[in-house]
Amino acid sequence: MKISVCVPVYEMKNGLSKRFLIEYLAHLMYQSYTDFDIVVSDQSENDDLKKICDTFSNVLDIKYVKNTSGIKNAANNVNHATKHATGDIIKLLYMDDFYVDRDGLKKVAEAFEKNDGKWLICGFVHCNQDKTKFFDQRTPWYGNKYPNGDNTTGNPSTYAVRKECLIEMDENLLWIVDGEYFYRSYYHYGDPIIIPEVQVCFREHEDSAFLKQEFRDLEVKERKYVEEKYKAML
C-alpha cells in the first residue's frame, strides 16, 4: 500500500521555510515504512525550496511541483499537492510539522488495511519553534457533528485518506478551513479511523497562521459561510 505524503510549502519570514523543510525531509528519511513518496507543492517565488528537494531526492522519492496559480492560501496549495499524488493513501503533513514516531507511516498503512474506514486521524503533540519543549499531548477524537467549522481534531497533519475518497479543501476559507475539511470528511464518509498514539508534532512558531489576527478576524464571516453552504446541501 503506497502512501503519498503531501506537503504544501511557501515562503516564511526569517528563512524558516528552508529550515523547516530540511528538518521535515530529514525526519521522513527515518520512517521504517518505505513504500511512500513525497509530493511537494511550492507557492514560493524563488527556487530555494526546490533546491532542497533536489538534494533530498537522492535519498527520498520526491515529486516537486510549482504552484503558479497565484492563489496564496493553504487550501489551494494542499489541493495542488493532492492532485499530483498517486499513492493508495494520501497523507497530509504540513511543512512546519513532523513525525515523532518512526513507525508512523507503517501504522497508517496497517490501520487502513485492517479497517474499512475512509479517512484517519492520529494522536499529536505540540512543540516550540526550536523543538526544545514539547507540550499539550492529545488523543485524537472527532466530536463535531455540526457544520459550523469547529475543530476538535487538530490540524490536517493528523489526517490521511484513501485516494478514491479524497476531497478538496474549500479555498474560500482561511481561518476555519481545517474544521470544515474534517466535517466534510465526516459528512461524506462517517467517523474516521483513529490511531490513539502520538504520531506527529505541531510546531508553534513566529510565522504560525493561527497567531495572526487577520485570520482570527475572519471567524464570524467564515462560520456564516459554512452554515449557509451546508444549508444548501442538507
What are these regions (language model features)?
Residues 2-4, 29-40, 60-63:
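Short loop->beta transition adjacent to catalytic acidic/histidine clusters or analogous donor-positioning motifs
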Residues 6, 140-222:
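Conserved nucleotide-sugar donor-binding catalytic segment
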Residues 13-30:
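Short, well-formed alpha-helical segments that are part of the catalytic scaffolds
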Residues 28, 42-45, 69:
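Conserved short acidic donor-positioning loop in nucleotide-sugar-dependent glycosyltransferases
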Residues 42-51, 94:
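A conserved acidic beta->alpha catalytic loop
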Residues 68-85:
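Glycine-rich, basic loop-to-helix element that forms the pyrophosphate-binding segment
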Residues 90:
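Short aromatic/hydrophobic "clamp" motif used to bind/position activated sugar donors
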Residues 98, 103-134:
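Conserved donor NDP-sugar-binding/catalytic core segment of glycosyltransferases
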